[in-house]
């Protein structure tokens, strides 16, 4: 008989990791499934304000960011058409997504959740008391099935795990901008730590921040033309 889980969560980013932590702390039997291997790099989402820290604190992880080496952020530096302004960012922190996401998952595992990586999940038919999910291991190619009373999909906009008739339809506006990001090895002091640096223009913007390991996270959004 297939194993029955209380909650199966697809996607191990911050939403999935936090959901797994919450559910595991409630004593539920939790499986967290992620198609990539972790830790993995990701640019956006490495800056944390008071609200983000309050959420972590409410889950018993008040020092998670600092324990992982997170660096304080105290200012936002803006540049537009040759002019510059600096705004205060009280109690901000920066921590790479490699460190943060993995730490959140580790907390969920410590609370009792089970995590599986490099595994694709496909939600199948629903029964009165559970939902069936097909899992495929990327390394072995082996396919298996599990059942869960609740399935949470936290796989982002690019998810392909729901049946077509349940997935909804994403609409991309013609005027929407393209996003791009990378991690840069930079040993100059032009972009000091402790600040978010942003350049703004009519056709888009670029922002960067120095991480706890000295690398720069750089991301931008640009008009299509």
Which residues fall in each region the model found?
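A conserved beta-strand/loop capping segment in the N-terminal third of enzymes
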Residues: 52-105
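Predominantly flavin-linked oxidoreductase catalytic cores and closely associated redox partners
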Residues: 107-225
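Conserved N-terminal glycine-rich FAD pyrophosphate-binding loop of Rossmann-like flavoproteins
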Residues: 36-57
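Glycine-rich FAD pyrophosphate-binding loop
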Residues: 12, 24-43
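Beta1/beta-strand and adjacent pyrophosphate-binding region of the FAD-binding site
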Residues: 2-15
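Conserved Rossmann-like nucleotide-cofactor binding loop
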Residues: 15, 38, 158
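Small-residue (primarily alanine) positions within well-ordered alpha-helices
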Residues: 12-15, 19-20, 24, 108, ...
